Curated annotation (Swiss-Prot):
PANTHER family: COATOMER, COATOMER SUBUNIT ALPHA. One of its GO terms (cellular component) is COPI-coated vesicle. This is Coatomer subunit alpha. It is a peripheral membrane protein. Its main location: cytoplasm. The modification Phosphoserine is found at residues 173, 402, 1193.
Length: 1224
């Protein structure tokens, strides 16, 4: 039995497969109906309206309906698309056992413990017929799949067959519906002529639990409490018992016919499912469960799937694997179908049977290995008991008759797997898991000791792949040695590329692609089962899951090509065609669209001409392609796909394409876009576009400064005029300062009432007339005339020597492949050199009316950007004598490769490589590696996600100390700055993909520092000890360890620090408490008692217990003091301490009572709240610190941990990560 899906739930009493979708309904004993997707292994929906167990359940064959019947006497019809009950049918007077839809008519058949069977019309929602005759509970009733018959099983020990042809004729006759509706109130409880008993089958000795028709033959199967499964045959006149299947040793719950084979399946309360051969009446297979009784069986109407419900849930299973055995060589496919070996020519599609296989094995062929040199095949058969597995060696006849193929004598031997390893040798893995090499006569030529393995696969001539529990090993048969290995668990299939350079290892939910040396190139995980695969001619691996055809590129990129209705097994991929076999062993050809993976492959292989061709001609659309191109560093290619202006804008900025970004910004006309474009243009020195952006965003201050630094005084004067119009005094004065216009500054100061400043400006700069006129306006009695500084110096902005009209010159580099293609495809004419406000159309700044101003008084931006004075696209010609041919001497001939565009000869700077610190960040998820790389932000993010750090202040010193160890410096040459080197801890293997930094802090260092903390605790320097313990605790997340033992030691170190910090902080707090009142003394004693429950070193625990003992003795709590004394003596203190303790103990035992009631129960386990220092007894809600594990009462959730001072209490985190092992 192959289990495909299993659920855990309450007892399952009913099951029904959906005829088309991969769904199954389960009705449970607790009243819930579950809808499962058994292919995706997910619960789709739950329906909970029945009161009590639900026993009957059935899907409708065409409509989105299902029916259920329960112990609440109700039949409910549900619509699973609407996810609700449509209506309820009432009429039964006791539990309903089964409910089934008719395959053709709108009928529902229900069987009940009220000893009746009812037929309901679900369209009119009425009962149309009641079948009476049984005199005990009716356990099951089902329609015949094609005839007007009903079979029922009852605890009255009979199986009855009912003829309902009268009901059909009545419902098809004219006026049937009207009479049906009129007569519904008068339905005869004791039956009508609509349904009559045709046969009564008696033979069971106990009550019958189930009866079912055969899908095509006139047979009935029944299962009963007499532990027997009976087969009955019927004709028009009679029915009789054919045979009985005995073997169950408890009540048989259910029995069904196999829809396509001569088999019967039954299950029982004896916790087993049995498969019976109908012709031999013998048991074929038995499947048992340890603790669960079986209650119901269901067969899928179209697929070879079955489901069984038991006490703990249900299972969906197959009796045997349906994967066809096949082998591909060149253009030929050999496969096994119906005990024939067939050969398919991929080119001509000629499919012929070449050989008949010997019969005898009841198990299908498991796998095949083909030898083209000798035209021989090895067919392996797996038994349920692996030790009984066999293989057959056949030589295929050369002149095969496709109509009547020969049945050559094969050589059969025992063995798990047989694989060809040479022209005339094959390897066999025998039942003892040792390797045998055999010749074509099936004779052993040698035995080879191999590493422990449970399966072998072909790996080229003379080589094998050996599978063990968690790896695959490449083994050389000739040299008897291991060549390479790769970690992957439970590989099921191995598929080599045509040139044997790559191999795909397929497991149940994973694919690992390796090269010939078994170096893993990529690892792909699938949620659904991987079924098969084949290599494309271009080196892409095409594989199938249960419901998809997918692709995988050796770099790790993978995706979906198309969806499948049913699983297929890929045999070959060529061009747009996928050749495959289905589960019926029929060869099929599916058409796929390879554009997506060929596009990615061309990008990876840098075949940019192919990429550009596909970009322009293929229908490659979607966000995934754009995201992929961005991720891989090709934003300029992504520009080809994008129509959305916002996305085009961000992509154009990313690849530095200012022209396309400008077009997109004009289309969007968004302030944020103009600001971003201005920033990027400024970085490129394109001040003309910067000017436009500042104009569009009305950023006057930046625009004025831009005009100042480019020396454009004319436009700066216009900006001053605009500021005056806008009544912006500050901007007006600032522009006057930029221009060095003193008289304008004096005027501005005078107009805004700053007479003193205006006078000083005029007098200092020598504007005597203006100064005198201002001086006269001062009132000598009220105002004082300011004094002029005799040492004043002239501060004048430097006059521009050469105004900057053109953009900042950029280094000319040869354009990338795609940028060039975009340029050739794009509009002609680059951005013009001059973006001038004068083009608005004014002769000067005399009158406001002549300015084209917006509501803010700002000049509208020019529209004519990018056009020359003479217009677009005009070429030289006319009067220019440039077309004349000159006769040049032959020695001046220049090779054609040297000439060309101006771009070709320019220097192309090499692309900047990845820095060592960036490599460290890329290769590691450990916080300390990011700190050593100087990437504090990512290190903080990792610490936040892993251990919940939210307060990074205490980490500042640790970060800086760690970062200082991240690099070394050395003097290279005199007069040159020092050089840096970046030490790696894996320096032998360090590189772009696996380099990680050397770490200075070791676990042993922290353990040594722990000893100092112990010493400080012993001498009573508690505050200093807490500080040192906390320093160790915060340092643990910055460790890197190599093995699981060290991970455990680091966790133990955290526990030690936590115990001491909580205990010592509580002791410090206790010593600060006043001792005047009794309540205060009780609180002091409680805290001392709690401290004795910290996990401390014995030397410290002795001190803690002595303190608690003294305090409790003084409080006259002798009973509790006695427990402390006994614990103290168990630790073996010094003799003088032990003597004193025994005296106190004897005094306490004379009067074993407690004078005061304290909040302390030594017998009830508890944790100490690290904030309130009160006990949290086991079973009470508790929140924990994600790093230290310190416990807190729920009210402290979300606060800073008192132990670490950096983490958030109760935060949900990934967990401490200090080793690469924790990421595997």
């Amino acid at each position: 039995m192959l289990t495909k899906f299993e659920t855990k739930s309450a007892r399952v009493k009913g099951l029904s497969f959906h005829p088309k979708r991969p769904w199954i309904l389960t009705s449970l004993h607790n009243g819930v109906i579950q809808l499962w997707d058994y292919r995706m292994c997910t619960l789709i929906d739950k329906f909970d309206e029945h009161d009590g167990p639900v026993r009957g359940i059935d899907f409708h064959k065409q409509q989105p309906l299902f029916v259920s019947g329960g112990d609440d006497y109700k039949i409910k019809v549900w619509n699973y698309k609407l996810r609700r009950c449509l209506f309820t049918l009432l009429g039964h007077l006791d539990y309903i056992r089964t409910t089934f839809f008719h395959h053709e008519y709108p009928w529902i058949l229900s069987a009940s413990d009220d000893q009746t069977i009812r037929v309901w019309n679900w369209q009119s929602r009425t009962c149309v017929c009641v079948l009476t005759g049984h005199n005990h509970y009716v356990m099951c009733a089902q329609f015949h799949p094609s005839e007007d018959l009903v079979v029922s099983a009852s605890l009255d020990q009979t199986v009855r067959v009912w003829d309902i042809s009268g009901l059909r004729k009545k419902n098809l006759s004219p006026g049937a519906v009207e009479s049906d509706v009129r007569g519904i109130t008068g339905v005869d409880l004791f039956g009508t002529t609509d349904a009559v008993v045709k046969h009564v089958l008696e033979g069971h000795d106990r009550g019958v639990n189930w009866a079912a028709f055969h899908p095509t033959m006139p047979l009935i199967v029944s299962g009963a409490d007499d532990r027997q499964v009976k087969i009955w045959r019927m004709n028009e006149s009679k029915a009789w018992e054919v045979d009985t299947c005995r073997g169950h040793y408890n009540n048989v719950s259910c029995a069904v016919f196999h829809p396509r084979q001569e088999l019967i399946l039954s299950n029982s309360e004896d916790k087993s499912i049995r498969v019976w051969d109908m012709s031999k009446r013998t048991g074929v297979q038995t499947f048992r469960r340890d603790h669960d009784r079986f209650w119901v069986l269901a067969a899928h109407p179209n697929l070879n799937l079955f489901a069984a419900g038991h006490d703990g849930g249900m299972i969906v299973f197959k009796l045997e694997r349906e994967r066809p055995a096949y082998a591909v060589h060149g253009n030929m496919l050999h496969y096994v179908k119906d005990r024939f070996l067939r050969q398919l020519d991929f080119n001509s599609s000629k499919d012929v049977a070449v050989m008949q296989l010997r019969s005898g094995s009841k198990f299908p062929v498991f796998n095949m290995s083909y030898n083209p040199a000798e035209n021989a095949v090895l067919l392996c058969t797996r038994a349920s008991n692996l030790e009984n597995s066999t293989y057959d060696l056949y030589t295929i006849p050369k002149d095969a008759d496709s109509q009547n193929p020969d049945a050559p004598e094969g050589k059969r031997s025992s063995g798990l797997t047989a694989v060809w390893v040479a022209r005339n040798r094959f390897a066999v893995l025998d039942r003892m898991h040792s390797l045998l090499i055999k010749n074509l006569k099936n004779e052993i030529t040698k035995k080879i000791q191999v590493p422990n393995c449970d399966e072998i696969f072909y790996a080229g001539t003379g080589n094998l792949l050996l599978r063990d529990a968690d790896s695959i090993t490449l083994f050389d048969v000739q040299q008897k040695r291991t060549l390479a290995s790769v970690k992957i668990s439970k590989v099921k299939y191995v598929i080599w590329s045509a040139d044997m350079s790559h191999v795909a290892l397929l497991a149940k939910h994973a694919i690992v692609i390796c090269n010939r040396k078994l170096d893993a190139l990529c690892n792909i995980h699938e949620n659904i089962r991987v079924k098969s695969g084949a290599w494309d001619e271009s080196g892409v691996f095409i594989y199938t899951t249960s419901n998809h055809i997918k692709y995988a590129v050796t770099t790790g990129d993978h995706g979906i090509i198309r969806t499948l209705d049913l699983p297929i097994y890929v045999t070959r991929v060529k061009g747009n065609n996928v050749y495959c076999l289905d589960r019926e062993c029929r060869p099929r050809v599916l058409t796929i669209d390879p554009t997506e993976f060929k596009f990615k492959l061309a990008l990876i292989n840098r075949k940019y001409d192919e990429v550009l061709h596909m970009v322009r001609n293929a229908k490659l659309v979607g966000q995934s392609i754009i995201a992929y191109l961005q991720k891989k560093g090709y934003p300029e290619v992504a520009l080809h796909f994008v129509k959305d202006e916002k996305t085009r804008f961000s992509l154009a900025l990313e690849c530095g394409n200012i022209e396309i970004a400008l077009e997109a910004a004009k289309a969007l006309d968004d302030k944020n876009c103009w600001e971003k474009l201005g920033e990027v243009a400024l970085l490129q020195g394109n001040h003309q576009i910067v000017e436009m952006c500042y104009q569009r965003t009305k950023n006057f201050d930046k625009l004025s400064f831009l005009y100042l630094i480019t020396g454009n005084l004319e436009k700066l004067r216009k900006m001053m005029k605009i500021a005056e119009i806008r009544k912006d005094m500050s901007g007006h004065y600032q522009n006057a300062l930029y221009l060095g216009d003193v008289s304008e500054r004096v005027r501005i100061l005078k107009n805004c009432g700053q007479k003193s400043l205006a006078y000083l400006s005029a007098a200092t700069h020598g504007l005597d007339e203006e100064a005198e006129s201002l001086k006269e306006t001062f009132d000598p009695e009220k105002e004082t005339i300011p004094d002029i500084d005799p040492n004043a110096k002239l501060l004048q902005p430097p006059a521009p020597i050469m105004p900057l009209d053109t953009n900042w010159p950029l280094l000319t580099v040869s354009k990338g492949f795609f940028e060039g293609s975009i340029a050739s495809k794009g509009k002609g004419g680059a951005l013009a050199a001059d973006i001038d406000i004068d083009t608005v159309g004014t002769e000067g700044w005399g009158e406001d009316a002549e300015l084209q101003l917006d509501e803010d008084g700002f000049v509208e931006a020019p529209e004519g950007l990018g056009e020359d004075v003479l217009g677009k696209g005009q070429e030289e010609g006319g009067g220019w004598d440039v077309e004349e041919d000159l006769e040049l001497p032959p020695e001046l001939d220049v090779p054609s490769g040297v000439s060309g565009s101006a771009e070709d000869g320019f220097f192309v700077p090499p692309t900047k490589g990845t820095s060592p610190t960036q490599i460290w960040c890329n290769n590691s998820q450990l916080p300390v590696d990011h700190i050593l790389a100087g990437s504090f932000e990512t290190a903080m993010r990792l610490l936040h996600d892993q251990v919940g750090v939210i307060q990074f202040g205490p980490y500042k010193q640790l970060f800086l100390q760690t970062y200082a160890r991240g690099r070394t410096t050395y003097q290279a040459l005199p007069c040159l700055p020092s050089m840096y080197s970046y030490p790696n801890r894996n320096w032998k293997d360090a590189g772009l993909k696996n380099g990680v930094p050397a770490v200075g802090l070791k676990l042993n260092d922290l353990i040594q520092r722990l000893q100092l903390c112990y010493q400080l605790t012993t001498v009573g320097k508690f505050e200093e000890a807490v500080e040192k313990f906390r320093s160790i605790l915060l340092s643990v997340p910055l460790l890197v360890v190599d093995n699981k033992q060290e991970i455990a030691e680091a966790q133990q170190l955290i526990t030690i620090c936590r115990e001491y910090i909580v205990g010592l902080c509580m002791e410090i707090e206790r010593k600060k408490l006043p001792k005047e009142t009794l309540d205060q003394q009780k609180r002091i004693c409680e805290m001392a008692a709690y401290f004795t429950h910290s996990n401390l070193q014995p030397v410290h625990m002795i001190l803690v217990l002595r303190t608690a003992l003294n305090l409790f003795f003084k409080l006259k709590n002798f009973k509790t003091a006695a427990t402390f004394a006994r614990r103290l003596l168990e630790l073996g203190p010094k003799p003088e301490v032990a003597q004193q303790t025994r005296k106190i103990l004897s005094a306490c035992e004379k009067n074993p009572t407690d004078a005061c009631q304290l909040n302390y129960d030594m017998h009830n386990p508890f944790d100490i709240c690290a904030a309130s220092y009160r006990p949290i007894y086991r079973g009470k809600p508790v929140e924990k610190c994600p790093l230290s594990g310190a416990c807190y009462s729920p009210e402290f959730k979300g606060q800073i941990c008192r132990v670490t001072t950096v983490t958030e209490i109760g935060k949900d985190v990934i967990g401490l990560r200090i080793s690469p092992l924790q990421f595997r």
